[in-house]
Amino acid sequence: MPVSLDGKLVVAISSRAVFDFEEENRVFERDDDAAYMALQRERLEQPAPPGVAGALVKKLVAFDGPAGTEAQRRVEVVVVSRNDPVSGLRVFRSARHAGLRLERGVFTRGRTPWPYLTPLKANLFLSANSDDVRAALDAGFPAARVF
């Protein structure tokens, strides 16, 4: 049976808000997506440092306590990112290393992430990208830029 997100606080958050991928992002902006993906693949086993919303995510996932089963959880943090799937692997490995319960993610490989907010039943979208926040707000979703 699929997991239901009904009745939960679902916070969708970008990977750059959770983890500090600013150096990698500069490679993407300076070079191209192939160089960016190669760098992320090269650093796959290197946990990323916390991003601007790292402490917030830690508090959100700790809200249910360590013993909360999937059915008992009231808060779900979902990564919604323009990143590619290889970078997604690094996100989840970094989360595991940091002790963060991040189990779901959407990696759009450059496409805008806000269309995924409805299927995820997201109550809030947080991102370090002001354009993505503006697009989500324009589409009627509660959103905020974290910095």
Region roles according to the model:
Residues 1-147:
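HAD-like aspartate-dependent phosphatase fold
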